[in-house]
Amino acid sequence: MAKKVIAIIKIVLPAGKATPAPPVGPALGPYGVSSVNFCKEYNAKTADKGGLVIPAEITVYDDRSYSFVLKTPPASVLIAKAASVEKGSGEPNRKKVGSITKAQLEQIAKVKFPDLNTQNLEAASRIVEGTARNMGITITD
């Protein structure tokens, strides 16, 4: 018999640096899940991805056990890293803060492809390009 799922928790944490303090503790505490054990497992799986934030989807079962799946980093984080900027523009239509090349855009689309709602790499590139445009980052050839 399969375990009964009581909650699915989505959380975004820095790779290899999760601690039981907020936001992990308050998210897992109400379900009786050990935040210390989750942090150890998360940090072990993400230790090689330093400097990125990695989303995790935690499935909590009725016997207080859990499993989690790591997602790809947010497109905005990958774009900001490629453009060497800390954050996007507050006024993306007026003020541009950086630029990335088409090759960098395609590389980011390949990384994000498993989590995007498309089966076409060209469409994935357009999705990432829209995110870059909304951050005030220009795409150059």
UniProtKB/Swiss-Prot annotation:
One of its GO terms (biological process) is translation. GO terms for molecular function: large ribosomal subunit rRNA binding; structural constituent of ribosome. Forms part of the ribosomal stalk which helps the ribosome interact with GTP-bound translation factors. It comes from Cyanophora paradoxa. The keyword Transferase does not apply. The keyword RNA-binding applies. This is Large ribosomal subunit protein uL11c. Coiled coil: none annotated. GO terms for cellular component: cyanelle; large ribosomal subunit. The lineage of its organism: Eukaryota, Glaucocystophyceae, Cyanophoraceae, Cyanophora. Keywords: Cyanelle, Plastid, Ribonucleoprotein, Ribosomal protein, RNA-binding, rRNA-binding. PANTHER family: 60S RIBOSOMAL PROTEIN L12, LARGE RIBOSOMAL SUBUNIT PROTEIN UL11M. PROSITE patterns: RIBOSOMAL_L11.
